[in-house]
UniProtKB/Swiss-Prot annotation:
Principal localisation: nucleus
Pfam annotation, one family: PRCC
Cystine connections: none
Intracellular or extracellular location(s): Nucleus
Organism: Schizosaccharomyces pombe (strain 972 / ATCC 24843) (Fission yeast)
One GO location term (cellular component): nucleus
GO BP field: mRNA cis splicing, via spliceosome
InterPro entries in alphabetical order: PRCC (IPR018800)
Quaternary structure note: Belongs to the 40S cdc5-associated complex (or cwf complex), a spliceosome sub-complex reminiscent of a late-stage spliceosome composed of the U2, U5 and U6 snRNAs and at least brr2, cdc5, cwf2/prp3, cwf3/syf1, cwf4/syf3, cwf5/ecm2, spp42/cwf6, cwf7/spf27, cwf8, cwf9, cwf10, cwf11, cwf12, prp45/cwf13, cwf14, cwf15, cwf16, cwf17, cwf18, cwf19, cwf20, cwf21, cwf22, cwf23, cwf24, cwf25, cwf26, cyp7/cwf27, cwf28, cwf29/ist3, lea1, msl1, prp5/cwf1, prp10, prp12/sap130, prp17, prp22, sap61, sap62, sap114, sap145, slu7, smb1, smd1, smd3, smf1, smg1 and syf2.
Protein name: Pre-mRNA-splicing factor cwf20
Biological function: Involved in mRNA splicing where it associates with cdc5 and the other cwf proteins as part of the spliceosome.
Length: 290
């Protein structure tokens, strides 16, 4: 297989397609699923369709010097359009452009092509360029985001006979039967009896001694008790013997001699502390049974 591809002429490719295979010693049933060989006539259109297109081009050109051979030769080398490849619309519906949501443009008028554009369409062979040109000519000075309108639209909106704006205010409606106000006389009031703590106590039949304990009796004096602070009973925690204080050893390295001296100096405190712990243990065992 060569890596270099040489260009071939159109005559050579046609000859190669039409020449039959040299060897016919193979079984034809083995190649049932092979690709079908394209013939030259398969790209041609039907005569009825070709004749119809020639008539359309004749009516569009309106020229006496019209050669059918040029149209036929162009149709042979022309590729299939997208509309020819797609299936026909359902119920023969017309494929019209969708209506635009914009209020400042009228696309239906822009899509209508003039009579002169038919000849341009057949000569160029593309309808999109004609639509774009007519759309740009008819649209004029149109803003992209509809912020500033065209001059013609602004002139049409302004009317000389237009009346000035008068705001309409919604007024509350008057009631058919308004509520009547009653005039209250000056002497029309309810007398309230004077209630006090003493009157309430008499109603409940509370003794004066109980009343003094419940609340203050303004007419009678309360009981005054002289208390000596120094003779007050001490709490139970203070009555218990206090535990001897033992100095703790400071953190860090220490010599053995310094630790022994500290323990000897606090010998009495250690003995008192151990004795207190034993007595607490005996008292708790007698009280709680363990």
């Amino acid at each position: 297989m060569s890596l270099v591809s040489y260009p071939r002429s159109e005559s050579e490719s046609d000859i190669e397609e039409e020449t039959p295979l040299a060897s016919k010693s193979f079984d034809p049933t083995l190649f049932q699923h092979a690709r079908r060989k394209l013939s030259v006539d398969s790209t041609k259109k039907s005569p009825k369709r070709l004749k119809r297109q020639v008539d359309l081009q004749k009516s569009s050109f309106n020229d006496k010097t019209f050669n059918e051979s040029d149209v036929i030769s162009n149709e042979r080398f022309k590729s299939n359009d997208l509309l020819e490849l797609l299936p026909a619309p359902k119920n023969q519906a017309e494929l019209a452009p969708k209506s635009s949501k914009r209020s400042d443009l009228d696309l239906n008028e822009n899509y209508l092509l003039p009579n002169n554009s038919v000849s341009d369409l057949t000569s160029t062979g593309s309808s999109e360029t004609v639509k774009k040109s007519t759309y740009s000519e008819k649209s004029g000075n149109v803003s992209l985001f509809n912020i500033v309108g065209s001059e013609s639209k602004q002139a049409s909106l302004v009317d000389s006979d237009q009346k000035p704006y008068q705001p309409i205010l919604i007024k509350p409606k008057a009631r058919a039967n308004p509520p009547k106000l009653r005039n209250q006389p000056e002497n029309d009031f309810i007398s309230i009896a004077n209630h006090s703590v003493h009157s309430n106590a008499e109603d409940i039949n509370i003794i004066n001694e109980d009343y003094i304990e419940i609340g203050r009796h303004r007419k009678e004096k309360g009981r005054i008790i002289d208390v000596d602070i120094n003779k007050l009973p001490k709490p139970t925690q203070e009555a218990l013997p206090s535990a001897p204080t033992i100095k703790s050893v400071a953190p860090g390295r220490h010599q053995l001699s310094s630790l022994v001296e500290m323990a000897i100096s606090q010998k009495d405190n250690f003995e008192a502390y151990f004795e207190q712990q034993r007595s607490n243990k005996k008292a708790s065992s007698q009280k709680y049974g363990f």
